[in-house]
Amino acid sequence: LEIGSGFGTSTSIMSEFSSNIDCVETSKQMTQVFKDSMEEGLFNASLLDLSIDEFFNNKKIKIQKYQKIIINGSLDEEPIDIIKNASDNAEIVCIIDNKNFKHKIVKYLKVEGNSNRFIIDEASSSYIYKYVQSEPFVF
């Protein structure tokens, strides 16, 4: 699951490694750009039809079905609701930029209802490719 798909930049990288990517983008402008990128054949993905409230309230989507969740863009808080609703053994990767984590890529691994947090690296656009190459990342 990719949250905040934007133009589809990271989606296009991930689509090289997975045949099935579900994406969430709630900005109407970005949704149209994302759809245009799919139509141009830049990547293959499924854009889920959700509002931001439906997503965060876990109404139309069951986060538990995903084992790998990537959140694009910087968060100023840890994604507590997503972690809480994720299934055991789910991995959640995001960038957090606040006073505790200055623009860090953070990975959460949920085990037996608890979440383990790992600070991976400084956030940079080339990092996702390095991460996908070095980690067993199956969607």
Model-derived regions, located:
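Active-site capping/gating segments
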Residues: 97-139
